[in-house]
């Protein structure tokens, strides 16, 4: 929608192999490419993907003519200096082996030392690639716990400052193991990092900074660490070896070694289970082609019809850039049914022209939001979808009425962990059951099973605060930020255009941006979070689509705060 004032010469699609993901993520990636090609036909498009053997496939799948103006090249994988080990978790034995049998021989040789132990004793760092489920249920930590004695408590002031910054952001307790205690923070005090897609982006950036500064000893990560982030380790332990995801394996191997900028031969080590040795050898020799057919051009009966409508809109050029919705969706939200619901909803949401607070959100308000979504969707929700949407609407309305991320996490935890009840009745606090909590799941999905994130069959004291934090982020980022905010923004804005009811415009901005303050909206568009806006806004003199001008008082900010805004100075 900003194409009129954008003069773009180059567009780089990094990690472009995402276009091959067999999920909605792959569909969205391809849709961005197609939309960009249409809007910026004179720009040069660059697709970068590691190890891909047929990079020209991106040109074919996006209908880019193969002529003298197009070019593709495969850069062969080069080994940057690594040694390889197998590990037998049952016996604890480590063995050396060669990735090329012709050069190194067919037999593995027992190692006279434990490479993980040696690395940690020498001040090195270890990346363990594991499943998200194993990180969340802590099984992976238990398996490597014998090494944690080699990870002493962090004492560096800069490291402690980063840990406190993270603690404050997620709202975790300090010196209180009964309530709001974060296992992630406790681990971080020993240089043990968790990294996965449900960790909030702000928290992830803190963790990456913590690692880049050399404070990380152990990092337990999922595929979120495969792509792009400059976080090298001395050892990469591939606990989750998936031969079907050979590209992921190659990306991970590239993280072993070069962990410092010192002019030394810092060889990296790669460790796999003994059973994965043959698969690893095959993986390193395997070609990595991507499909020459876009997800947009494939009919998939398994996905919800909403996604098929989205694909059709991209192909037919009927996607509305103003709302990030299809034109068919926009027509749905202009319906008389929605026009009848909105006035009642606005009367409930605003009292004396002020938006209600979080405690005043009623069941009736949430039901109208349900009805609006079902009208947009064009069908009733199944029970499991409705449960997920109910939780999402509650979180969205908390955000709209001024709750920060940590506030929302604490509210959800307080309910599911029965905090008030346990504090009120300390004599039976240990036996009080948890409350049922619905977790994030992608909707629409008519086949979604109906099961909780946290069941009411466990004890309240056993509720894990980190689980609530991660699930809250999934709702805010993957559902509210990525989908619901666009839908409800369009509904309220269209009603405002039709009725001129200022409350509807305010509600549209609350849903989309979490504020109606023009300066704050622009600051959000510039990429600042609400936590950053809180301390930075007084120093903003003016802001619009052209530039952001700061007052001289920015010189009084902390160095860490100045670093955040230095890119805006020229």
Provide a role label for each language-model segment.
Residues 1-4, 77, 113-218, 233, ...:
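Conserved C-terminal RecA-like helicase domain
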Residues 2-39:
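SF2 helicase catalytic motif II
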Residues 8-10, 218-241, 268-271:
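A short beta-strand element within the Helicase C-terminal
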Residues 16-23, 193, 226, 242:
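Catalytic acidic motif of RecA-like/P-loop NTPases
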Residues 34, 42-151:
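Conserved interdomain linker/interface between the two RecA-like ATPase lobes of SF2 helicase motors
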Residues 40-43, 246-289:
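Conserved segment of the helicase C-terminal RecA-like domain
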Residues 243, 311-570:
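C-terminal accessory/interaction regions of large nucleic acid-associated machines
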Residues 275-334:
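Long, hydrophobic alpha-helical segments
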